[in-house]
């Protein structure tokens, strides 16, 4: 079946290579912010209702300034600027008799027999279309939201409640995928209570209701619908198509490989009205193709088969948007997630290619070599591509061919032939994606926000890779937006307000698209961040405004090289030298933690009286940690100046300058006895050895920011580091009470 076709049949050849890829460490973010940090310093807002879960449907209304949320038994209307203020809620529970029927059918009365709102669409200027599971009795209603933003309204229209079959799923565990075009709703759902009859369904509007052929695995084979989009094909609205993204069990897989899940993109024509004698009230223009997201390897491709979400990023030409999709693996051996990018031209090219064909049960899937009837199956009836005005006018051989050949032979491959961004061996899986196109000083960049199943959002930027047209994804931030680490179930973005709205089972969160101040206080840190939202303005790292005519806007997203942009910058303060003291034979910890998790830390050492700097190498007595340098069994010759520097993007940035003074045990004891004997003194200048005495005295409260150390303890020298650290904190008896006294002047010494 060719490269793409073979991939469709055997998606898991490269097991050995996949295991090797799986052993690789996941890419770290440049900046990691906890829930507490986001809430305290970066404006994270959250919203939740009491005794309510499952916030799955999000709808951004920029005109009214509202975020509409569908949840268990509720629809909520939130303020787009701050979702925790001016919230309105509408209770919409399932009727008692429906809940009882649901319970009698064997469903859980507390977790399944509720009305889980799955769909929210803007129906007209005053109403929303909302659909929910209705305790396994799908139902839809029109919700009045008013005309103006100044007076938000949220009211259920009791006279416009209708059956939701074919619009909303029965089961709350099933995802809802739909799009409202005009007054027509296109949905991918299970149309029966048992969840076996999956269909692509059109309802509402003036055109007849249509569905896919039921119980035909060639059309749909246990699909899981993900997203639906309406994308124009030309200036003629008769050519408009609806694209469905889903995953299903592959019918083209070899029986020896078992049940294999693949990702698909399907298409239907919006003006399809079904066939005249065959495929009556069924789609006559339905086609599907495999959506491939894989990493090429020597032994074969490693596939990410589980499509999780798709985001359509509009371009100047509304016919050619970019499609950003997130995938995960289905293998229990190799686990990872990936982002692949697709162009609509490649999708259309696959649907204009050869059809997949199989002669019989014992035959292989091949490219169809016979005559394809006219008009070509999958083409819309319009004046653009033919003379047919309706699908009911299509010849019988066209309808019959469309019924038997819904699958295309060629797959849709990602731009660049490989994922834009992937994470292997991470403790999370990608679940959702949203994208924003940002104008920067050196061009336009796509910024991706990727939700995970552990309540985090990854901020990734797509940057050009060398001179080739392909791009690579750089992980800028990891944001913990949910305190309970609940999986991200939905995301919506407001480019106008620069806000991201994230939903989970437990809450809805709101976070800004940028946190420029978090990147650093100096020019180099701001430029190294490569955040297209941010630039150095000569004083601080602030929001970049493309229209601002400011002279000192420094930004380099493509290369992240501050050597030129920040060469004349005087914002970085002089690197002060901090005195640190240690006792011979004990341990000392020199703390130095770079702001960026992607930076490599280098330590150099300058011995007293020597001008040359030598690199501190890893050996038995030295251990590098994420927070600094640990020196064990200190010697007098360890005294000197230690310089900590961060290396990132080939740029070296000094961070700390620490002067270590190693004292003998005799000197330490003498200083301690002098401290005991010296009388109290009025407040005055603090001596250089006060910090040292606070460190060596038991319970002295030494600062962790400069040094962690202990007196020599021979009995503990052979123990592991953690044991020695615990030993320093143990006490076998209560400390003797000591009188409080203030610092003394140097005259007592």
UniProtKB/Swiss-Prot annotation:
Positions annotated as glycosylated: 82, 124, 427
CDD domains: Sema_3B
Region (Disordered): 702-749
GO process terms (BP): axon guidance; cell-cell signaling; chemorepulsion of axon; negative chemotaxis; neural crest cell migration; positive regulation of cell migration; semaphorin-plexin signaling pathway
Name of a matching Pfam family: Sema
Function: Inhibits axonal extension by providing local signals to specify territories inaccessible for growing axons.
Protein's name in the database: Semaphorin-3B
Gene this protein is translated from: SEMA3B
């Amino acid at each position: 079946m060719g490269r793409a076709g073979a991939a469709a049949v055997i998606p898991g050849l490269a097991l050995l290579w996949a295991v090797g890829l799986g052993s690789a460490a996941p890419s770290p973010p440049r900046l990691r912010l906890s829930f507490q940090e986001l809430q305290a310093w970066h404006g994270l807002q959250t919203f939740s209702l009491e005794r309510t879960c499952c916030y799955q449907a999000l709808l951004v209304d920029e005109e009214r300034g509202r975020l509409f949320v569908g949840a268990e038994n509720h629809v909520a209307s939130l303020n787009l600027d701050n979702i925790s203020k001016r919230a309105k809620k509408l209770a919409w529970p399932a009727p008692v008799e429906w809940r009882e029927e649901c319970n009698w059918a064997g469903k859980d009365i507390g977790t399944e027999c509720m009305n889980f709102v799955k769909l929210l669409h803007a129906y007209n200027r005053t109403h929303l279309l909302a659909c929910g599971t209705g305790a396994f009795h799908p139902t839809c209603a029109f919700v009045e939201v008013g005309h103006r933003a100044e007076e938000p309204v949220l009211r259920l229209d009791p006279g416009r409640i209708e059956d939701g079959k074919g619009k909303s799923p029965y089961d709350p565990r099933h995802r809802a995928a739909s799009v409202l075009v005009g007054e027509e709703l296109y949905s991918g759902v299970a149309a029966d209570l048992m969840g076996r009859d999956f269909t692509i369904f059109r309802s509402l509007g003036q055109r007849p209701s249509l569905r896919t052929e039921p119980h035909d695995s060639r059309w749909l084979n246990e699909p899981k619908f993900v997203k639906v989009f309406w994308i124009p094909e030309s200036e003629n609205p008769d050519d408009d198509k609806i694209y469905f993204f889903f995953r299903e069990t592959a019918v083209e897989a070899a029986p020896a490989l078992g049940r294999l899940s693949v990702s698909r993109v399907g298409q239907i024509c919006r003006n399809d009205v079904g066939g005249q004698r065959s495929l009556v009230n069924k789609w006559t223009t339905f086609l599907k193709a495999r959506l491939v997201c894989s990493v090429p390897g020597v032994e074969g491709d490693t596939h990410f088969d589980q499509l999780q979400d798709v985001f359509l990023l509009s371009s100047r030409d509304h016919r050619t948007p970019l499609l950003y999709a997130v995938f995960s693996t289905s293998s229990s051996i190799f686990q990872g997630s990936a982002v692949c990018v697709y162009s609509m031209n490649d999708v259309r090219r696959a649907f204009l290619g050869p059809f997949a064909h199989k002669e019989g049960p014992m035959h292989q899937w091949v490219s169809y070599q016979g005559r394809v009837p006219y008009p070509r199956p999958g083409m819309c009836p319009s004046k653009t591509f033919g003379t047919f005005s309706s699908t009911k006018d299509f010849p019988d051989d066209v309808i019959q061919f469309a019924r038997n050949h819904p699958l295309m032979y060629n797959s849709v491959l990602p731009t660049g032939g490989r994922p834009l961004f992937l994470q292997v061996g991470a403790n999370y899986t990608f679940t959702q994606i949203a994208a924003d196109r940002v104008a920067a000083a050196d061009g336009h960049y796509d910024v991706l926000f990727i939700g995970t199943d552990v309540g985090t959002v990854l901020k990734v930027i797509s940057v050009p890779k060398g001179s080739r047209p392909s791009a690579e994804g750089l992980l800028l931030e990891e944001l913990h937006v949910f305190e309970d680490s609940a999986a991200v179930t939905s995301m919506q973005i407001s480019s106008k307000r620069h806000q991201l709205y994230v939903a989970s089972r437990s809450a809805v969160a709101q976070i800004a698209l940028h946190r420029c101040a978090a990147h650093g206080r100096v020019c180099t840190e701001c430029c190294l961040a490569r955040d297209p939202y941010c630039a150095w303005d000569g004083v601080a790292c602030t929001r970049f405004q493309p229209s601002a005519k400011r002279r000192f806007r420094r930004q380099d997203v493509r290369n992240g090289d501050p050597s030129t942009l920040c060469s004349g910058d005087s914002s970085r303060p002089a690197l002060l030298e901090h005195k640190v003291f240690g006792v011979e034979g004990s341990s000392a910890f020199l703390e130095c933690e770079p702001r960026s998790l992607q930076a490599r830390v280098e330590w150099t050492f300058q011995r007293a009286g020597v001008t040359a700097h030598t690199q501190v190498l890893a050996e038995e007595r030295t251990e590098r940690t994420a927070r600094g340098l640990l020196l064990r069994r200190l010697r007098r010759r360890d005294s000197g100046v230690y310089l900590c520097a961060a290396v990132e993007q080939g740029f070296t940035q000094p961070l700390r300058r620490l002067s270590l003074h190693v004292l003998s045990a005799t000197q330490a004891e003498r200083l301690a006895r002098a401290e005991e004997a010296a009388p109290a003194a009025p407040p005055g200048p603090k001596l250089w050895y006060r910090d040292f005495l606070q460190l060596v005295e038991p319970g002295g409260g030494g600062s962790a920011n400069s040094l962690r150390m202990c007196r020599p303890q021979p009995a503990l020298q052979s123990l592991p580091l953690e044991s020695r650290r615990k030993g320093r904190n143990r006490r076998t008896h209560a400390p003797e009470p000591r009188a409080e006294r203030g610092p003394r002047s140097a005259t007592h010494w």
